[in-house]
Each structure stands twice: as C-alpha cells, then as structure tokens.
Amino acid sequence: MTNKKLKSVFIVDDSAIERSMLTDHLSKNEGVEIKEFSNGESCIKEIVMGNVEEPDLILMDYFLETSPGSQSDGLEVLMKLKEICPASEVIMLTSVSNDKIKELAKNKGALDYVVKSQISYQQLDDVLQKHFS
C-alpha cells in the first residue's frame, strides 16, 4: 500500500466509551474527519446510501454485539466493507490477542489487527504512522 495522508476515519464499535476514547485520541490529528458507528450495519448502510464518502480508514471492533439475525460479526462486516469500499483500509480492534483471528482478519482484507489495552493507543499510532504518513 502506498502511504497517503489520513483524512477520514470511521470508528465502528458497540462500546460508546471505546468510540469516545478513540475519537478523542484521533482528534489530535489536524484535518482528520471522524465518524462513529455503534454497529457494522449502520456503517455499511451510510456508505451504500451515499450519505457519507468512503473513508481512508475504518477502525472496527472484532467482537461487535449483535442482535438475532444481525450481520454484525466483525469478519462478516469486514468482508462487506472491503466489497463496497475496497480502497478503504480496515484495522481490526479487539480485546483478545489471538494469532488465529489476527491471521484470519488479515486474510479477509484487514490492514492490521490491534489489541485493545493500556498500550494500544501507541500501537495504533505506530500502525497509522506506518501506513498514513
């Protein structure tokens, strides 16, 4: 991937606290537009309906809460997002460090996989610096 300037980020996480913390952290980057979504369906719907432009980056929780019949599984949403906006990069966020899930997410199109923890913001900054500088 060619490094490009990060201009727009979508945050998809069922935790309002996580979304808020990520938004606060990413807001330190000048000129970055951030939109929050509490589930994968709302993010996909907004893109498909043309209500939002495709983002440069989507930060998405791997374990999204779902309702019965929902399509919010992180990998399913990842595959759909890569189908409808292939130029957008997706970084999966999760509270569980699991090499099998990490590899599966990357095989399905995720740019990277960051484990949520006290040091995850530094890891996230490192990934963003690597790909969007």
Positions of PLM-derived features:
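Short amphipathic alpha-helix used as the core "switch/output" element in two-component signaling
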Residues: 69-86
